[in-house]
């Protein structure tokens, strides 16, 4: 079974849960991601943007599904990748960032910041759209996580919460930590 079929099976197993999530009908990852983010953000335009960005970039879908698989593998919660996609706040934050980063890289910085801000309000983290994050990133709950514009997180990195990258909170002296490597 693939991720979409696993999510459908989980929703069929709990009609009340499916009603609360209110995701409707979906057949592809971009459709599911769009519906999920419309619910998370409370904004249909955010969901539509998420769906269109994923629909236009198969590599982004591949990286995101790898993030989800790695989160499910490293996390201690039951339910596998389907539950991770539906319920993991950290995975949602990484997905929102990946969409905002793609939009930023394509030159629409206002839309990228709007997506970032809309999602950050409900996910309790702040990841600048210019921050570079490698595949396989596991952000546990993501609460209090901040990554500044110059942050670089390499592949297969795990972070729990209350971490700030890219600031020293002063005007001189210490150098900000901006890059996290796999071994950390």
Regions found by a protein language model. Give the residues of each.
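Flexible, glycine/small-residue-enriched loop-and-beta-strand segment within the central core
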Residues: 101-184
């Amino acid at each position: 079974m693939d991720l979409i079929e696993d999510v459908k099976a989980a929703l069929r197993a709990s009609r009340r849960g499916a009603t609360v999530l209110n995701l409707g009908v979906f057949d592809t990852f971009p459709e599911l991601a769009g519906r999920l983010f419309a619910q998370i953000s409370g904004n249909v335009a955010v969901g539509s943007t998420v769906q269109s960005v994923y629909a236009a970039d198969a590599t982004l879908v591949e990286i995101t599904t790898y993030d989800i698989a790695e989160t499910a593998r490293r996390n201690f919660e039951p339910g596998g990748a389907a539950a991770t996609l539906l319920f993991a706040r950290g995975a949602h934050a990484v997905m929102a960032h990946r969409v905002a980063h793609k939009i930023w890289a394509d030159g629409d910085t206002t839309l990228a910041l709007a997506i970032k801000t809309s999602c950050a309000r409900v996910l309790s983290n702040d990841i600048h759209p210019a921050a570079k994050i490698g595949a396989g990133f596991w952000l546990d709950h993501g609460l209090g996580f901040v990554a500044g514009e110059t942050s670089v997180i390499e592949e297969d990195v795990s972070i729990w919460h209350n971490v700030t990258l890219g600031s020293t909170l002063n005007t001189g002296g210490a150098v900000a930590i901006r890059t996290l490597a796999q071994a950390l």
